[in-house]
């Protein structure tokens, strides 16, 4: 249930930078989005002047972008709101190689797979950046300039400008060299390809700023150095911090899995719940990075966290805003309505969007049953009770509900009162929920 293109454009038009800051650079600093950069004074002056062209790259090493990429997309959008023109680079060539991981060699994906993922990422990038006005986003693919290059031309025209000693000092390369696995020439050459990207965008479109994660700093500066050597030009780079949770756990993971921007991989319901579960110690920092709320509103929410943390107002606002950004306002509204109905806080389960409710139940303990299976058995199958005898006692004590109605008969078939889509919501006590998907022939 994503928004239509017109509604998505309305959402983009409603976004704005905080007018309490004189310069977008100051706002980026306040939001905690600058970890490392080239000359800060020069960057601040550059961003306060005439519009510039800038870019960020996204490699198609998976079928979808994830929350780490969202940091870059929203940073790009803030610069666009300040009048600067974004170029979204989807790495059709660099995605065939993959940047070196500190631990092990990447598995190379098939060219056909990478080409398919390029299309998926292009669509995702365009959701977050405006295609209207003089500074409309433009998408580029680095395969367009690397594919025509012969190996000899690549080595003569680009490779000769890179010093091996400097390349060996890059963090990921150094880590791999000190490991048992080592590093292949394929991955070692990645930083040259990314440097070439910046050079081409500098030549073709006048790009003078590249943004990316701070873990990519060596690759970012390979481009600024290449531009200096080849063109005698001056270009900049900004590295955003790698976000971690206050308890030291890795940000952007849910049950050990990445939180993806594609609803087929991470449902809007799962996205909403991920943000709703943000710790009090982290929520204000997340609001700064992942929403367009202005400083006065974030400071108000910070006071609310300190004075009335049990209300979780900041978490609810964070979950609403990010889910709306990623999946659209309609999907966010459907998720909230389904959550309220699921947990008995209002709303009729039968009136909820079927796909949203199904995705919510898949996040809970659930089972697939035939229509004739007894509710008592479904309680055991979903883990709400450990045995049939415990299930019968729970029903006899009035402690079990199905679709928010108290269950009177433990032997009643699950197929007797289904929601649209063949679903049953079981509840034991006030808060323990499970789902049953009823199918013929199971």
From Swiss-Prot:
The keyword Cytoplasm applies. GO terms for biological process: tyrosyl-tRNA aminoacylation. One of its GO terms (molecular function) is ATP binding. A motif ('HIGH' region) lies at residues 60-69. A motif ('KMSKS' region) lies at residues 250-254. It comes from the Bacteria. Its EC number is 6.1.1.1. L-tyrosine binds at residues 55, 190, 194. Pfam families: SYY_C-terminal, tRNA-synt_1b. Residues 373-438 form the S4 RNA-binding domain. Belongs to the class-I aminoacyl-tRNA synthetase family. TyrS type 1 subfamily. Homodimer. Catalyzes the attachment of tyrosine to tRNA(Tyr) in a two-step reaction: tyrosine is first activated by ATP to form Tyr-AMP and then transferred to the acceptor end of tRNA(Tyr). This is Tyrosine--tRNA ligase.
């Amino acid at each position: 249930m994503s928004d239509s293109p017109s509604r998505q454009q309305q959402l983009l038009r409603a976004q704005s930078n905080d007018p309490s800051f004189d310069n977008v650079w100051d706002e980026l600093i306040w939001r905690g989005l600058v970890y490392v950069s080239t000359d800060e004074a020069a960057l601040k002056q550059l961003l306060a002047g005439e519009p510039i062209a800038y870019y960020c790259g996204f490699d198609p090493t998976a079928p979808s972008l994830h929350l780490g990429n969202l940091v870059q997309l929203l940073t790009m959008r803030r610069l666009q709101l300040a009048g600067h023109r974004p170029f979204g680079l989807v790495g059709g060539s660099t995605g065939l190689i993959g940047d070196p991981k500190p631990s092990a060699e990447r598995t190379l994906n098939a060219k056909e797979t990478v080409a398919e993922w390029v299309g998926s990422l292009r669509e995702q990038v365009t959701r977050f950046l405006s295609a209207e006005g003089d500074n409309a986003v433009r998408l580029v693919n680095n395969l367009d300039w690397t594919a025509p290059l012969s190996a000899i031309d690549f080595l003569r025209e680009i490779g000769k400008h890179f010093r091996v000693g400097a390349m060996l000092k890059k963090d990921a390369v150094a880590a791999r060299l000190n490991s048992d696995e080592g590093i292949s020439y394929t991955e070692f050459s990645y930083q040259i390809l990314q440097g070439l990207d910046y050079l081409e965008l500098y030549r073709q479109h006048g790009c003078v700023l590249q943004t990316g994660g701070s873990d990519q700093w060596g690759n970012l500066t390979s481009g600024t150095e290449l531009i200096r050597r080849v063109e005698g030009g001056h270009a900049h780079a900004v590295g955003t911090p790698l976000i971690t949770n206050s308890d030291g756990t890795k940000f952007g993971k849910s049950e050990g899995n990445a939180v993806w921007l594609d609803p087929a991989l991470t449902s809007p319901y799962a996205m909403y719940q991920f943000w709703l579960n943000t710790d009090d110690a982290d929520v204000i920092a997340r609001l700064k990075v992942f929403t367009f709320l202005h400083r006065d509103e974030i400071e108000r929410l910070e006071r609310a966290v300190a004075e009335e943390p049990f209300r979780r107002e900041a978490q609810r606002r964070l979950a609403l805003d990010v889910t709306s950004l990623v999946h659209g306002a309609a999907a966010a509204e459907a998720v909230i309505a389904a959550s309220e109905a699921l947990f008995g806080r209002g709303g009729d389960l039968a009136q909820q969007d079927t796909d949203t409710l199904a995705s919510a139940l898949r996040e809970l303990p659930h089972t697939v049953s035939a229509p004739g299976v007894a509710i008592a058995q479904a309680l055991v199958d979903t883990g709400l009770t450990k045995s049939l005898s415990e299930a019968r006692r729970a029903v006899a004590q009035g402690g079990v509900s199905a679709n928010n109605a108290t269950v009177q008969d433990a032997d009643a078939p699950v197929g007797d009162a289904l929601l649209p889509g063949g679903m049953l919501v079981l509840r034991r006590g006030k808060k323990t929920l499970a789902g049953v998907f009823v199918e013929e022939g199971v």
